[in-house]
């Protein structure tokens, strides 16, 4: 077995699905076309993400015939917004120590201190039944453990870093939805306590997937990295960043000159 560290830009959902292009399907096709794939199946992954959610440090475990050459694989993926950044041969599936998600929230004049106070209440082990979407295909306990939530800000956006053992469907996006209401003064900080009360039921907005990135699914693996692939990956995101800065400038100009 091999573990592959992968990144992607959110244009596809992650999990294999019939008659749909997904991160897993596209990756498996690339591994097959380059002659590395032994079995067309993802054995295990670090996290399943929805369409719109990006990833920097997700991983998949797959059966390969031989040691992969990442530059060959990434050449097949270059127009898909998917990259294999590292790999390691393994004998058993590694345990994920934690998952780190980051949400980028436009800075609209939030009460950041209130957001930080609300976030503190979510740290620890709680029932996140109000802060997740039920997956009807699986009966899962809503009890989850959040290790840390950190809030930072600049002129344009807030960064919400959430680190936990595991997450329920839409849990991070609903946590951000709750913090948004607190930060805009629509709900008091104490409202978070009600959301975490296992006997209380209340709907919470789910924020868009485009603001979310899986920073890392942490495992005790020393990946073998390919410098060329890393360089091309950084070049892509460098160009992406420049384009977004231009778009921000255009948007500000439109708002400035529109009466």
UniProtKB/Swiss-Prot annotation:
The active site is at residue 50. It catalyses: uridine(38/39/40) in tRNA = pseudouridine(38/39/40) in tRNA. Substrate binds at residue 101. InterPro entries: PsdUridine_synth_cat_dom_sf, PsdUridine_synth_TruA, PsdUridine_synth_TruA_a/b_dom, PsdUridine_synth_TruA_C, TruA/RsuA/RluB/E/F_N. It comes from the Archaea. Its EC number is 5.4.99.12. Pfam families: PseudoU_synth_1. GO terms for molecular function: pseudouridine synthase activity; RNA binding; tRNA pseudouridine(38-40) synthase activity. Keywords: Isomerase, tRNA processing. It is an enzyme of class 5 (isomerase). GO terms for biological process: tRNA pseudouridine synthesis. Formation of pseudouridine at positions 38, 39 and 40 in the anticodon stem and loop of transfer RNAs. NCBIfam families: hisT_truA. Belongs to the tRNA pseudouridine synthase TruA family. This is tRNA pseudouridine synthase A. It comes from Methanocaldococcus jannaschii (strain ATCC 43067 / DSM 2661 / JAL-1 / JCM 10045 / NBRC 100440). The lineage of its organism: Archaea, Methanobacteriati, Methanobacteriota, Methanomada group, Methanococci.
């Amino acid at each position: 077995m091999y573990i592959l560290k992968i990144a992607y830009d959110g244009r596809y959902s992650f999990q294999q699905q019939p008659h749909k292009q997904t991160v897993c399907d596209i990756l498996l096709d690339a591994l097959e076309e380059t002659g590395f794939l032994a079995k067309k199946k993802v054995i295990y992954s670090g996290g399943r993400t929805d369409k719109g959610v990006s990833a920097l440090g997700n991983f998949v475990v797959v059966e390969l015939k031989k040691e992969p050459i990442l530059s060959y694989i990434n050449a097949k993926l270059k127009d898909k917004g998917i990259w294999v950044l590292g790999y390691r041969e393994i004998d058993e599936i590694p345990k994920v120590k934690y998952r780190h998600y980051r949400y980028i929230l436009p800075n609209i004049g939030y009460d950041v201190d209130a957001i930080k106070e609300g976030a503190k209440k979510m740290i620890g082990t709680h029932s996140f039944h109000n802060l997740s979407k039920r997956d009807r295909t699986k009966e899962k306990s809503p009890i989850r453990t959040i290790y840390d939530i950190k809030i930072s800000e600049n002129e344009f956006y807030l960064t919400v870093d959430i680190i936990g053992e595991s997450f329920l469907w839409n849990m991070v996006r609903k946590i951000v939805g709750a913090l948004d209401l607190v930060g805009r003064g629509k709900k008091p900080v104490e409202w978070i306590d009600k959301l975490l009360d296992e006997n209380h039921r209340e709907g919470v907005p789910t924020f868009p997937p485009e603001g979310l990135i899986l920073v890392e699914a942490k495992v005790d693996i020393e990946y073998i990295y390919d410098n060329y692939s890393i360089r091309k990956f950084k070049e892509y995101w460098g160009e992406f960043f420049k384009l977004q800065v231009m778009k921000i400038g255009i948007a500000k100009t439109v708002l400035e000159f529109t009466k």
